Amino acid sequence: MHIAVVSLGAFGHVNPTLELVTELVRRGVRVTYFCTEGFRTIVEPTGAQFVAVPSWMEAHAGESGEDKSDVAATVPFLFLHEAEAYLEPVLAVLKEDRPDA
């Protein structure tokens, strides 16, 4: 069995998956884990195959010059941009190595 995990590059998104991924790998499941490069050293010890994806948020950090006082209102839009940045690289890998889940 092959499972693909796609995670936003944030500790609150990655950390909860690590124990599950470790257990899946221990049970012989092949796991491909997509996340931003900064999480490679955290994900690789699980035994999953790590695939780095680009981060729109990292690439555009500090560009807008806008008032950051109402950041909560913009978070959903940031996540949409981040998901869009992931889409092509994730689909390219999965097209060649289709997961079961």
Regions found by a protein language model. Name each.
Residues M1-A101:
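Glycosyltransferase specificity loop/lid
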